[in-house]
């Protein structure tokens, strides 16, 4: 059933809200009506924040995390352990691990995992830059913290093979996270323990 609206401007706003993930037209309508009840200045600030987000946010040239400048606050922090890299699938995983307060090293965001079914190969991910970082920086350990899915496991194995010639220690987070789960959805306690109880990758697979 096609919903009719008394205002073209309202319908236009609903159309835009409905493009967001998980937002249907009923929710979009509630959001639009909520904004109508707010002071105009609040709505302007909301809109300006969205525009600034899209136009001015950048990605760290080292780890590919989101940043307000060329280097993110994590990479620029001298108190972080510069010898440890935690490899994650996406930016949300960085936030999830940071919330555990159990990790003080650096990160490397791949931008996804190898998934032939989705047309994503090694060349589509930040793998070459990872290998370059390990080869050029004083990295002693690389922690693989990818989702416990078939694609995540495939990517883990590929990364291990790529990093093996460098001699760096490659570890993987403990299997406290259920198979098939994504890092960002794990609770903080479980995720924190998985990082602390990580094991050498070579001990976790059979060659």
From Swiss-Prot:
Domain called Toprim: residue spans: 83-178
Keyword DNA damage part of the UniProt annotation: yes
Keyword vocabulary terms for this entry: DNA damage, DNA recombination, DNA repair, Metal-binding, Zinc, Zinc-finger
One Pfam family per UniProt: RecR_C
Zinc finger (C4-type): 60-75
GO biological process, one term: DNA repair
One MF annotation (Gene Ontology) recorded for this entry: DNA binding
HAMAP family named among the record's database cross-references: RecR
Record family assignment: Belongs to the RecR family.
Function: May play a role in DNA repair. It seems to be involved in an RecBC-independent recombinational process of DNA repair. It may act with RecF and RecO.
Protein name: Recombination protein RecR
Organism: Porphyromonas gingivalis (strain ATCC BAA-308 / W83)
GN (gene name): recR
């Amino acid at each position: 059933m096609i919903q009719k609206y008394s205002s073209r401007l309202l319908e236009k706003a609903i159309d835009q809200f409905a493009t967001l993930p998980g937002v249907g037209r009923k929710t979009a309508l509630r959001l639009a009506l909520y904004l109508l009840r707010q002071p105009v200045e609040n709505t302007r600030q909301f809109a300006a924040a969205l525009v600034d987000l899209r136009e001015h946010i950048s990605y760290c040239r080292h780890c590919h995390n989101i940043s307000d400048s060329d280097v993110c606050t994590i990479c620029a922090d001298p108190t972080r352990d510069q010898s440890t890299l935690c490899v994650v699938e996406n930016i949300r995983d960085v936030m999830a691990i940071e919330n555990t307060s159990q990790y003080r090293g650096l990160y490397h965001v791949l931008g996804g995992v190898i998934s032939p079914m989705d047309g994503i190969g090694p060349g589509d991910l930040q793998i070459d830059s990872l290998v370059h970082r390990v080869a050029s920086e004083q990295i002693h350990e690389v922690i693989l913290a990818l989702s416990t899915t078939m694609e995540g496991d495939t990517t883990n194995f590929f990364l291990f093979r790529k990093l093996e010639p460098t001699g760096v220690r490659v570890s993987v987070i403990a299997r406290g996270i259920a198979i098939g789960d994504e890092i960002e959805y794990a609770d903080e306690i479980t995720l924190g323990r998985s990082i602390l109880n990580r094991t050498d990758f070579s001990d976790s697979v059979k060659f």
